[in-house]
């Protein structure tokens, strides 16, 4: 068995409290992901649980991170909690369409399904 790779990251990068700690004062919010990716090699995108990301935003994620960076996306709560995993084909298609700029790269990691209790 070959050794695995351990990655360290956080659930998101858009935290104002990180100004002056991770993000230098004066660094615009549009550059936070790039700075985050200088320190960590993976991130969980929690926002996709609450709303679909735009294709433009996903393209920016890809461009702002180094080649070996990895994204873990949360599946939509609409599919999991509201639809209760029933008739979710169209929703999965919309999700896949939005994340396509990421999915076609090696930066695409797991899609996390936060199931209800």
Residue ranges and their predicted role:
Residues 1-117:
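Residues lining hydrophobic/aromatic ligand-binding pockets adjacent to catalytic sites
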């Amino acid at each position: 068995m070959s050794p695995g790779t351990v990655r360290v990251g956080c659930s998101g990068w858009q935290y104002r409290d990180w100004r002056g700690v991770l993000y230098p004062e004066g660094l615009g919010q549009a550059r936070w992901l790039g700075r985050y990716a200088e320190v960590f090699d993976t991130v969980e995108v929690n926002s996709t649980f609450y709303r679909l990301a735009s294709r433009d935003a996903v393209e920016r994620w890809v461009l702002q991170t180094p080649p070996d960076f990895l994204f873990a996306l949360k599946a939509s709560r609409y599919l999991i909690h509201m639809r209760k995993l029933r008739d979710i084909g169209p929703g999965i298609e919309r999700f896949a369409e939005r994340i396509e700029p990421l999915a076609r790269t090696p930066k695409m990691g797991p899609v996390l399904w936060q199931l209800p209790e």
